[in-house]
Amino acid sequence: MSATINPHQVLTFFVAAAFIRLTVGAVTTFRIVPGEGPPRRSELVSLGFWAMLIEGTPVQLNSWLVVPGCVGMVGALVLFDWARRSIRGQYFSYVFSNDIPTMLWTGGPFAYIRNPFYASYLLAMASVALMMPSLIRLLVFAGAAMLLTSAARHEERKFAQSPLSSEYEPYKQRTGRFLPKILA
C-alpha cells in the first residue's frame, strides 16, 4: 500500500511553517515597552494571522493562485529575515507602544520601505488569502491591513515628535510605507 500525498496538507504545512517562522521571529525581535503591556490591537493582528490558517473553508488547489501565493509567502519570509538581519540584534517595540524612538534604521530593506516587518506580515497574509481564498480570510486580511496601516501611522507620529524628527522627515520622503517608492 503506497502513501499518497495530499496537496492540501502539504500547502497547509507550508503555510503553518511560515507562520511559525514569522511568529518566532516576532517574539525574538519585538519587546514590550517597560510599564506597558502588549497593546490589544497587537494581539488582534496576531490572532488574525493565525485565524487565516485555521479557518476551515475548503481549498481548491487546482487554482492558478497557489503558485503566486507560495512565491508571495517566500517573499514575506525573505523580507522579514532581511529586516531582522538589518537591525543587528536590536529590538523593536510592539505595535502601538508609546515609547520614543531612539534609532532610525535606514539600511537593508529600511532603505526602501519604512515598515518592512509590517509589510512582511501583510504579504504573508495576502499570500494565504490568495492561496486559500475565502471570504473570512479576505476579511481578516483587510482588517489586519487596516490595523497595520494604523500602526505604521502611529510609528510615523512618534518619529515626527522625537529627537529624530529632522532625520526622519527626509527618510519618509524617499521611502514608501509598505512598498518602495518608484519615483523619487
Named regions from a protein language model:
Residues 106-107, 111-119:
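Histidine-centered phosphotransfer motif of kinases
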Residues 1-106, 124-184:
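Membrane-anchoring alpha-helices and their flanking helix-loop junctions
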